[in-house]
């Protein structure tokens, strides 16, 4: 790592960038900052590998973004083993009819348990980012020259910049002067993994739109 540390007293060095959350957004941020001459740390409340409720679809722009960061990392992302390549999305509308969208860009489905851990391992092995797991953010204290990040285990760190990549229940967001989210912009997801599902089109993600749940939908992603 880069030699920064999270400790319990106030003598800790000021880290240039602390990313709260080590999912795809946080990991991509750390990868993008590699080589910028900054000290970087990621703090995540979980220990990797860890799961997230998601449809597990990894769309085309993901790979283009990684290519911009590093062609080598983009290649490794395409060659990732835990995947099901997808070429088509089929959408079923409320009257039962459907239409298909055939994608030119490369994409696949991958369980978040595996995908997120792959990205975190890229950060771990290819950058000097310090990774602190099992670190749940409690609060931020904004001082003149730094932000003090306080964690639930009573440890803390100082940062010149804090990036909130801590998801739907973001702690960082509470300290950003934006309008708070309302029920209008809130949604929930329920996911299960099923085996031996029959009558699936090859390399196809299926979306089912029902009148009572618009703009929500049901999905079957192989």
What are these regions (language model features)?
Residues 12-25:
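Beta1/beta-strand and adjacent pyrophosphate-binding region of the FAD-binding site
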């Amino acid at each position: 790592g880069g030699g920064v540390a999270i400790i319990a007293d106030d003598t800790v060095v000021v880290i240039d960038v602390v990313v709260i959350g080590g999912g795809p957004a946080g990991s991509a941020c750390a990868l993008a900052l590699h080589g910028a001459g900054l000290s970087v740390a990621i703090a995540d409340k979980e220990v990797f590998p860890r799961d997230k409720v998601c449809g597990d679809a990894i769309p085309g722009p993901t790979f283009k973004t990684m290519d911009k960061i590093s062609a080598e990392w983009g290649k490794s992302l395409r060659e990732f083993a835990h995947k099901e390549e997808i070429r088509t999305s089929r959408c079923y509308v409320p009257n039962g009819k459907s239409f298909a969208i055939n994608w030119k860009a490369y994409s696949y489905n991958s369980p978040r348990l595996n995908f997120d851990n792959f990205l975190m391992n890229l950060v771990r092995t290819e950058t000097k980012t310090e990774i602190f797991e099992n670190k749940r953010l409690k609060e931020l204290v904004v001082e003149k020259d730094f932000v003090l990040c306080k964690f639930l285990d009573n440890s803390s760190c100082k940062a010149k910049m804090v990036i909130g990549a801590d998801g739907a229940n973001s702690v960082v967001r509470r300290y950003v002067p934006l309008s708070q989210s309302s029920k209008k912009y809130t949604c929930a997801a329920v996911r299960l993994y099923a085996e031996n599902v029959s009558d699936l089109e090859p390399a196809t993600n299926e979306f089912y739109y029902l009148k009572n749940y618009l703009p929500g939908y049901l999905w079957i992603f192989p």
